[in-house]
């Protein structure tokens, strides 16, 4: 069975490796163009391209698929049975969705219809969801509105960051899409179920502006945001006129004026919130490295009563 693969980041690269390891023929891999990255802004190949080259696969990097006759012709010439799409980042027009014999399967990191859109992992943590998961979806022209082929649940742990949930769902998604491809190969079709009309939510893209901590919120709400925005864009506060990223914290039952520092020690930097307080245990000063609070407190001291 011929499988076109389309994806860009690590989440997708894991799925590509799994599909290849399962023995499926992959005549073509699509990924986004190389982009400048890092402090030196060095042109860097996306993880899917790196994986594809290691696997000896053909890679193409079109800027767009909409109104791109050359790309459409390339896809048609492959005569693929199905396309697997995972965090590709380009919009697939209807003529592309219709090109493979069995259409396009998407690996989506939420339990649809909850958290359709760009940042499902982060929004699930931020909202305090007890669980999330992966859906393998038969793509249509809408935003994550296609019929669901399979659903795989994951219990969000109380200390899970977006990075940790991402890595768990990456492995779940890779295994899930292989299982569904194997079913398609053996049975010639997949049983897909329409998404329910109730329970639809949208996972808006994250912004640096919303990552700024609002101390008037409850400590529980802020703690979830810190985990949801870890590692990027990272929740932050202003400290000495510069943004300081907050990497890990925990809720403590203390009270004070919102934003007031209650204590600063090797055990934690405790800041009052709208309800309860937050004990910060890991942070990253502007231009510095991530550090635990003991390392931070050894070189700096924030007086009780100071405002963040």
UniProtKB/Swiss-Prot annotation:
GO terms for biological process: conversion of methionyl-tRNA to N-formyl-methionyl-tRNA. InterPro entries: Fmt, Formyl_trans_C, Formyl_transf_N, Formyl_transf_N_sf, Formyl_transferase-like_C_sf, GART_AS, Met-tRNA-FMT_C, Met-tRNA-FMT_N. Keywords: Protein biosynthesis, Transferase. GO terms for cellular component: cytosol. Belongs to the Fmt family. NCBIfam families: fmt. This is Methionyl-tRNA formyltransferase. It comes from Neisseria meningitidis serogroup B (strain ATCC BAA-335 / MC58).
């Amino acid at each position: 069975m011929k499988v076109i693969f389309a994806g860009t980041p690590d989440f997708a690269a894991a799925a590509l490796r799994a599909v290849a390891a399962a023995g499926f023929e992959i005549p073509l891999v699509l990924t986004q163009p190389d982009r400048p990255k890092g402090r030196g802004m060095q042109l860097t190949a996306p993880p899917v391209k790196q994986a594809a080259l290691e696997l000896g696969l053909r890679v193409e990097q079109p800027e767009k698929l909409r109104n791109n006759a050359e790309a459409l012709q390339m896809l048609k010439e492959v005569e693929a049975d199905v396309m697997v799409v995972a965090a590709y980042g380009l919009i697939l027009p209807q003529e592309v969705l219709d090109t493979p014999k069995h259409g396009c399967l998407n690996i989506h990191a939420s339990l649809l219809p909850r958290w359709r859109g760009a940042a499902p992992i982060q929004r699930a943590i931020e909202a305090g969801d007890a669980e999330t998961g992966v859906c393998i979806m038969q793509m249509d022209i809408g935003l994550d509105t296609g019929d669901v082929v399979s659903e795989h649940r994951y219990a969000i742990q109380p200390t899970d960051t977006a990075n940790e949930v991402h890595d768990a769902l990456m492995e779940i998604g890779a295994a899930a899409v292989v299982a569904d491809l194997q079913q398609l190969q053996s049975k010639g079709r997949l049983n897909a179920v329409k998404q329910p009309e109730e329970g639809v939510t949208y996972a808006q893209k994250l912004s640096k502006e919303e990552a700024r901590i609002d101390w008037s919120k409850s400590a529980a709400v802020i703690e979830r945001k810190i985990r949801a925005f870890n590692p990027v864009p990272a929740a932050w506060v202003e400290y000495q006129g510069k943004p300081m990223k907050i990497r890990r914290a925990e809720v403590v039952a203390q009270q004070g004026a919102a934003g007031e520092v209650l204590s600063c020690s090797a055990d934690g930097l405790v800041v009052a919130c709208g309800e309860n307080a937050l004990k910060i245990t890991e942070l990253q000063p502007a231009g510095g490295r991530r550090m635990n609070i003991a390392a931070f407190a050894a070189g700096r001291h924030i007086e009780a009563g100071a405002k963040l």
